[in-house]
């Protein structure tokens, strides 16, 4: 299954978490979608890129390690994780149309975010 399709499956899970003001562990997310936790960063990249390009709080900030309570090293959409989580909790996600598989693929292609720094991303966006 393509990563963009998996990302499209993850989106509603994350919006539900945001509405309920909850985080989701990598382990639980992996079990919910049938993917090993080690492969989730690759699947969260299109969501992170889409949120950055659309000026939305980064939904991927809600996926955290069980022990650390923090997103993995691939999360670079914001330097202040607690503030970004608070922004994601406050956002009106039920009013946002979920992105399509094609929109997620386009976002990841236009702004590949995994493995880049926040400074590099801002530079790519001209910010």
Language model regions located:
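Nucleic acid-binding interface residues in structured DNA/RNA-binding domains
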Residues: 1-9, 15-18, 22-127
């Amino acid at each position: 299954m393509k990563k963009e399709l998996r990302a499209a499956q993850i989106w509603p899970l994350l919006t539900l978490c945001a509405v309920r003001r909850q985080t989701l562990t990598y382990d639980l997310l992996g079990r919910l979608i049938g993917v090993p936790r080690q492969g989730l960063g690759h699947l969260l990249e299109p969501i992170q890129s889409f949120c950055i390009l659309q000026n939305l709080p980064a939904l991927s900030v809600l996926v955290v390690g069980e022990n650390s309570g923090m997103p993995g090293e691939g999360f670079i959409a914001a330097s202040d994780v607690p503030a970004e989580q608070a922004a994601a909790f406050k956002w009106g996600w039920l009013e946002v149309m979920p992105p399509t598989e094609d929109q997620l693929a386009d976002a990841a292609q236009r702004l590949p975010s995994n493995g880049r720094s926040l400074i590099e991303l801002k530079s790519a966006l001209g910010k």
